[in-house]
């Protein structure tokens, strides 16, 4: 004899799926960490939606942490040129690397603040959304806290003086050589 418990919980499971389904994410927004950060003091760099959504109408939703106000920005998803990464290496040669930045810049943000960012992309009759990811802007540094040491300027002055003295000695030597050569 089968237990009636699964039959009673089936409507509950279906209701939960119906409620949670609109928040399900179809794609992820990639972020970058390490030597290059997508966070600036008053803006953030967000990776563009995936290539299969090229030509779709994207709405970027930015919500400040602990706030219900959502700022929306709409744009058309640009075409893909190669792989869609936040930073991709275009060319790498002897001693240099050319990179391309494929990102959307969110501007006019408050320094040192956490934001939640997500996409909603409509292409034709289909709509896809991204998972909401947290990103933070960098705090603004106090100008008085920045050290005003000699840094590079002292070295530049020394090199300039040495080169000036060497050039003076070279010109004096050249004039002396011309004068001694003309006397003979």
From Swiss-Prot:
It comes from the Eukaryota. Expressed only in the urothelium. Localizes to urothelial superficial cells. Residues 26-84 form a propeptide. It holds the Pfam family Uroplakin_II. It is a single-pass type I membrane protein. One of its GO terms (biological process) is epithelial cell differentiation. Its main location: membrane. Glycans are attached at residues 28, 57, 66. The chain crosses the membrane at residues 156-180. Interacts with uroplakin-1a (UPK1A). This is Uroplakin-2. The lineage of its organism: Eukaryota, Metazoa, Chordata, Craniata, Vertebrata. The gene is UPK2.
């Amino acid at each position: 004899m089968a237990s009636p418990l699964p039959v009673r919980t089936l409507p509950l499971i279906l209701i939960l799926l119906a409620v949670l389904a609109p928040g399900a994410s179809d794609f992820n927004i990639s972020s970058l960490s390490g030597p290059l950060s997508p966070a600036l003091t008053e803006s953030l760099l967000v990776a563009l939606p995936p290539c299969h959504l090229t030509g779709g109408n994207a709405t970027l939703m930015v919500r400040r942490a602990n706030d219900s106000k959502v700022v929306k920005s709409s744009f058309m998803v640009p075409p893909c040129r190669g792989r869609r990464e936040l930073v991709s290496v275009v060319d790498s040669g002897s001693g240099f690397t050319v990179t391309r930045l494929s990102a959307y810049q969110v501007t006019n943000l408050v320094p040192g603040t956490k934001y939640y960012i997500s996409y909603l992309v409509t292409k034709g009759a289909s709509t896809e959304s991204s998972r909401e990811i947290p990103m933070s802007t960098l705090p603004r540094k106090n100008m008085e806290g920045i050290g005003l040491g000699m840094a590079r300027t002292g070295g530049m002055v020394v090199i300039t003086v040495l080169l000036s003295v060497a050039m003076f000695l070279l010109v004096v030597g050249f004039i002396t050589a011309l004068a001694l050569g003309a006397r003979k």
